């Protein structure tokens, strides 16, 4: 069972900045592309990469803040998350501070569950959803290679299907730097550039 929530909102959508939601199946390489895009635009103060708060151990490729389930529940109850969800037995949240960045006109990039897309579109004025994907056999090989205990069954993770309704899809097979450049163009412009 997955729980999702968006912070209570007023009738006005949060903007004028952009919220770029990077979604996709386990093993698609979301963190790889996000980290490479972050490096490519490190000198751009208009782009902010959200740091997720999670109740599982972060891998070397992730820039997450690990907390206990009790601490997460306290943060959640205090309203400290802009978006939060539960999936695969863990809780995930994006700090409320990202709202201030978006109000200031910055672009915020976040790796999220596909299940928070609709709540995010209901809360923010400018949301771009980027689906990172790869063929099933590539996903399975990547999940097996990282051997993260929290991944559970590889078959279940690869077979999981949640509609994303993306604005843009990147098939992450081949050169990850080229795909990171594609992602950066979307981050900067809200869509791929010709």
From Swiss-Prot:
Pfam families recorded: AAA_33
The record's EC number reads 2.7.4.23
Instruction: Give the EC class as a word.
Output: transferase
- Catalytic activity of the protein: alpha-D-ribose 1,5-bisphosphate + ATP = 5-phospho-alpha-D-ribose 1-diphosphate + ADP
Record GO terms (molecular function): ATP binding; ribose 1,5-bisphosphate phosphokinase activity
The pathway where this protein functions is:
Metabolic intermediate biosynthesis; 5-phospho-alpha-D-ribose 1-diphosphate biosynthesis; 5-phospho-alpha-D-ribose 1-diphosphate from D-ribose 5-phosphate (route II): step 3/3
Q: Which domain of life is it from?
A: Bacteria
Residues that bind ATP: 24-31
InterPro entries attached to this UniProt entry: GK/Ca_channel_bsu, P-loop_NTPase, PhnN
Q: Which UniProt keywords apply?
A: ATP-binding, Nucleotide-binding, Transferase
> What are its GO biological-process terms?
5-phosphoribose 1-diphosphate biosynthetic process; organic phosphonate metabolic process
Q: Which family does it belong to?
A: Belongs to the ribose 1,5-bisphosphokinase family.
HAMAP family in the cross-refs: PhnN (MF_00836)
This molecule's function is given as:
Catalyzes the phosphorylation of ribose 1,5-bisphosphate to 5-phospho-D-ribosyl alpha-1-diphosphate (PRPP).
Q: What is this protein called?
A: Ribose 1,5-bisphosphate phosphokinase PhnN
Give the species. Answer: Rhodopseudomonas palustris (strain ATCC BAA-98 / CGA009)
């Amino acid at each position: 069972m997955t729980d999702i929530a968006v912070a209570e909102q007023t009738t006005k959508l949060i903007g004028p900045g952009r919220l770029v939601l990077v979604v996709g199946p386990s093993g698609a390489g979301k963190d790889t592309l996000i980290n490479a895009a972050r490096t490519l635009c490190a000198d751009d103060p208009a782009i902010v990469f959200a740091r997720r708060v999670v109740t599982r151990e972060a891998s070397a490729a992730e820039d997450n803040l690990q907390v206990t389930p009790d601490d997460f529940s306290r943060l959640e109850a205090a309203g400290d998350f802009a978006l939060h969800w539960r999936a695969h037995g863990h809780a995930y949240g994006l700090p409320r501070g990202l709202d201030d960045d978006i109000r200031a006109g910055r672009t915020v990039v976040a790796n999220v569950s596909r299940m928070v897309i609709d709540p995010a579109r209901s809360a923010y004025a400018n949301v771009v959803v980027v689906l990172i994907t790869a063929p099933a056999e590539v996903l399975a090989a990547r999940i097996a290679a990282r051997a993260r205990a929290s991944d559970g069954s590889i078959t279940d993770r690869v077979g999981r299907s949640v509609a994303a309704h993306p604005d843009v899809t990147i098939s992450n097979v081949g050169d990850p730097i080229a795909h990171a450049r594609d992602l950066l163009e979307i981050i900067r412009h809200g869509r791929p550039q010709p």
